[in-house]
Curated annotation (Swiss-Prot):
The modification Phenylalanine amide is found at F13. GO terms for biological process: defense response to bacterium; defense response to fungus; killing of cells of another organism. Signal peptide: none annotated. Belongs to the frog skin active peptide (FSAP) family. Temporin subfamily. It is found in: Secreted. Antimicrobial peptide with activity against Gram-negative and Gram-positive bacteria and fungi. Also shows hemolytic activity. This is Temporin-1SPc. Keywords: Amidation, Amphibian defense peptide, Antibiotic, Antimicrobial, Cytolysis, Fungicide, Hemolysis, Secreted. It comes from Lithobates septentrionalis (Mink frog). Expressed by the skin glands. GO terms for cellular component: extracellular region.
């Protein structure tokens, strides 16, 4: 689950 969050955050930031 965390991997998905980090992926989105990485794309945004």
């Amino acid at each position: 689950f965390l991997s998905a969050i980090t992926s989105i955050l990485g794309k945004l930031f």
